[in-house]
Amino acid sequence: DPSKSRGLGDVYKRQLSTLLVLVSQELGAKSDSSNSDSNDFIALESTADTPDPLSKECVDHSGLGRHDHSMLAIYINGEQREIPTNLGINTEICNQEGGNMHTVHTHDASGRLHIETAADVDMPLGVFFDIWGVHFNETGIFDYRVSNTHELIMTIDGVTNNQFDDYLLVDGKEITIIFQARS
């Protein structure tokens, strides 16, 4: 039965993927590396490889069920990372008149996220990183991964929050993501 073999293949793929992540984390910890730049042979799993379907939805400014804003700041080893201008606008996916913006996007480099949807739906923070095409969850951000030497911290209005990519964006909230050496 082809459907059974296809499903079994999916199980093996998930197991192999999990094994690769565990081996990568172990090798990364032993090499005391906090990102892939110094450890290029390790294939890092990325959340951007399996984007949330909401990251592929396109909108314009008319008929919105939701139009909210949150602020995002990202720090990697003490240095603030710039969030690109017009991220999620006129992309390969969202480029049509009347639908040239992704559901979460920026208009400038201030870190202000625009959450705009046709219906009033919950929007996970991970959708923004999927649109950006970069990794973000409890295991790390960009090519930086949590290890025995480095940690990932996220705060919402200064309060620690461990929801990471699953955090549902709320109007007016300030999100700070910090990747740093453990103290």
Spans of features found by a protein language model:
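Single conserved hydrophobic/aromatic residue that forms the stacking wall/gate
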Residues: 1-12
